[in-house]
Amino acid sequence: GGVGVDAAEMLVRCGIGNILILDSDAVSITKKNRQLLALESTLGHQKSEVMAQRLKDINPQLNLTVIDEYLTPENVEELLSPHKIDFLVDAIDTLSPKLALISYCVNNKLPLISSMGAGAKFDATKIKIADISKSFNCPLAYIIRKKLRKMGISKGFKVVFSEELPQRDAIIEMEERNKKSQVGTISYLPAAFGLIC
């Protein structure tokens, strides 16, 4: 999505020759404000396929593995263990798979950097990298820390987060079932998180 696409592209442009991308989402019109892949010509296409095409266009010799599946606590090991991964960039924005991925990496001593929340924030100069235990002013990082502590993990991996306090007017209350609020995201911030990852 907004973070992972930019992270993957910059890694390929830096000369990294082996990349694995995992994403099961389709490109949607609601992402056009912040995702590099979200264009009229790509709407409805699988993000992993569009990204694979883009990365191969940058480096035709790229050794690229594409996994077009939704990562869950139940399948994280099955999806990742067959691959030799030297470093992992976590750009997941959904809590359960994010926790599963972080836990898998920490428990298997796989180095990673995890992107925290860019929603309701605007100031790119406030982006920081720190151990998860040192992150602050980020509601997503707070929840991640709390849930990971219950899993016996309190530190040991880097996160990209913003020290900016969330802007309350960027949070919209929703009346839809199973959705309490929607957090607005400015176009450039997820990309900045991805570049820093």
Name each model feature, range by range.
Residues 1-197:
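Adenine nucleotide-associated cytosolic modules
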